[in-house]
């Protein structure tokens, strides 16, 4: 039985109709005996990975926000220090105009007759609400806000800086020339974010190839948690970047020891839910991987990124050609797959295996005699990337996690949904 002041406070606020956000560690699922029960919300209400709690038989809800996010529905990103493009998606906390004036709260009664205010029905979608942060709800040239000048309300652009042009997700793509079972042989310059993770043998000298990985910044590699079920200490791991051939050294490859191995604390080794891990590369300076044509970080997605169903994406890795193959591929391979609708990414289509909201499905929809070679991930590809083109940059959508066989017709592969873990990634990458 749990009977804490925090729990009682949450219950009282829910019943009183309060809607607010709580830090993750402040919320408890169990209530004292006799209080009203509450559970997950019936519909998506919280952004950026926030968890929604709703009192039974009541419409009121509480958003439990990940670190770095706040607001009624976790819509404010407290870490955003610049805006991209025109700043339509900027959700930071900058509140000063170019003239140095303080912005007016979007919920102010003084703005009631203005077109854009925090009381619109679509205010949350536009980034407006009970705050005075700069926004661009009308697709203007940059973020702006209302300020008071000479007793008048005027629109002024804000002094929030523009983000530097990102180089993540850029590459020199080479059209694959050789076909292989399950995919196409490719060059590392086509997938410069691909990492190869090796582990020391426990009972003999040398090391063995363990899993794929994804470079997401100079010193961090994202991969799958299930790769580390044997609990290797970080000093027994090695990460290689810039390698076309799995065991043959490349001219421009970069090799790193591992400083830290962080496995998601709620990883389920039965269902593979929360199948995500981070490796911190070891370096004597703040810079680890050096950017080149063969080594480059992938772009992480925006939290609200939703690509259309059946969007064509790519996977890469050094895994087996098919499930019956005795060895991993000697050369890096790529596969072309399409994002499945969520309605087709369920246990029903995957032999009753558990599929959670932290997973997404992608597969090769071609079939028949013309396309006998179905592209798919296989053993050894785990931890590698599922990337899609977004805003002219390749962007990470998934981490290769599990599947039923390899290259089976009409059976998609299952990937860890990266957008659900942006807060977790950010928190664990902090010094």
UniProtKB/Swiss-Prot annotation:
Disulfide bridge map: 41-52, 46-63, 65-74, 82-163, 103-145, 134-158, 168-299, 211-227, 219-288, 313-388, 345-361, 378-406
Major localization class: secreted
GO molecular function: serine-type endopeptidase activity
GO cellular component term, pick one: extracellular space
TM stretches of this protein: none
Domain of life: Eukaryota
Compartment(s) of residence: Secreted
The keyword Protease is annotated on this UniProt entry: yes
One BP annotation, GO: platelet-derived growth factor receptor signaling pathway
Quaternary structure and interacting proteins, as annotated: Monomer.
Protein name in the entry: Salivary plasminogen activator beta
Annotated source species: Desmodus rotundus
Top-level taxonomy: Eukaryota, Metazoa, Chordata, Craniata, Vertebrata
């Amino acid at each position: 039985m749990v009977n804490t002041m925090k729990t009682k406070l949450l219950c009282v606020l829910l019943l009183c109709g309060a809607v607010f956000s709580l830090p993750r560690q402040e919320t408890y699922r169990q209530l004292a005996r006799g209080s009203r029960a509450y559970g997950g919300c019936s519909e998506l209400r919280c952004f950026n990975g926030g968890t929604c709690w709703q009192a039974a038989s009541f419409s009121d809800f509480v958003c439990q926000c990940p670190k770095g996010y706040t607001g009624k529905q976790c819509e404010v990103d407290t870490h955003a220090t610049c805006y991209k493009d025109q700043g339509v998606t900027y959700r930071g906390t900058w509140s000063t105009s170019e003239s140095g004036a303080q912005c007016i709260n979007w919920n102010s009664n003084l703005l009631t007759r203005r077109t854009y205010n925090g009381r619109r029905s679509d205010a949350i979608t536009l980034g407006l609400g009970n705050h005075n942060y700069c926004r661009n709800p009308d697709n203007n040239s940059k973020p702006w806000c209302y300020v008071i000048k000479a007793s008048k309300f005027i629109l002024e652009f804000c002094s929030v800086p523009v983000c530097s042009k990102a180089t993540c997700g850029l590459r020199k793509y080479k059209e694959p020339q050789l076909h292989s079972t399950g995919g196409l042989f490719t060059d590392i310059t086509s997938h410069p974010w691909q990492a190869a993770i090796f582990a020391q043998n426990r009972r003999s000298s040398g090391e063995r190839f363990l899993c794929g990985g994804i470079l997401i910044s100079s010193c961090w590699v994202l991969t799958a948690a299930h790769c580390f079920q044997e609990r290797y200490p970080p000093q027994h791991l090695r990460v290689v970047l810039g390698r076309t051939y799995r065991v043959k050294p490349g001219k421009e490859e970069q090799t790193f020891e591992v400083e830290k191995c962080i496995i998601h604390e709620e990883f389920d080794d039965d269902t593979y839910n929360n199948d995500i891990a981070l490796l911190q590369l070891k370096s004597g300076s703040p810079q680890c991987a050096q950017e080149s044509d063969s080594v480059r970080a992938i772009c992480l997605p925006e939290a609200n990124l939703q690509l259309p169903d059946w969007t064509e994406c790519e996977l890469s890795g050094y895994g087996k050609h098919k499930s019956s193959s005795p060895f991993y591929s000697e050369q890096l391979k790529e596969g072309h797959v399409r994002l499945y609708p969520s309605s087709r990414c369920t246990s029903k289509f995957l032999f009753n295996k558990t599929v959670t909201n932290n997973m997404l499905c992608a597969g090769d929809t071609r079939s028949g005699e013309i396309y006998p070679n179905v592209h798919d991930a296989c053993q050894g590809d785990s931890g590698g990337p599922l990337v899609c083109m977004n805003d002219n940059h390749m962007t990470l959508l998934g981490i290769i996690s599990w599947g039923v066989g390899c290259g089976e017709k009409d059976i998609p592969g299952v990937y860890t949904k990266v957008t659900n873990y942006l807060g977790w990634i950010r928190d664990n990458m902090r010094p």
